Amino acid sequence: MDIIREIESEMLRKDIPDFKPGDTVRVYFKVIEGGRERVQAFEGLVIKRRGKGLSETFTVRRISYGIGVERVFPLHSPRLEKIEVIRRGKVRRAKLYYIREKIGKAAKIKELVQQPDKENNNTEETNA
């Protein structure tokens, strides 16, 4: 079993940003059409992450011309060019399947507001 883990650890990508369900991401994925290869961007809401190691995947959902489109991406795929986190969402679930039934504003996720560090604020106030 340790041999398998060693081989898997070599194949794991290190350039993946930290993102969770509820975040809006833009995924750049290499698409091969005929003999050509191009990069296609897919932007949407992360509704789930599953698995561990090489088999880890995440599902991104977006609305395209009024129709919901979901795409499952393998996290450590060599065809995955890069992932950009557009905005962080504030959710209390790991799987956001309920978003599939929501339409319009009801499907919006609240944005997570980053709190400033308390340590930095205390030092600024005492210095001023």
From Swiss-Prot:
GO molecular function: structural constituent of ribosome
NCBIfam families cross-referenced by the UniProt entry: rplS_bact (TIGR01024)
Keywords: Ribonucleoprotein, Ribosomal protein
GO BP: translation
Alphabetized Pfam families for the sequence: Ribosomal_L19
Disulphide bond pairs: none
Full protein name: Large ribosomal subunit protein bL19
Source organism of this protein record: Caldicellulosiruptor bescii (strain ATCC BAA-1888 / DSM 6725 / KCTC 15123 / Z-1320)
Gene: rplS
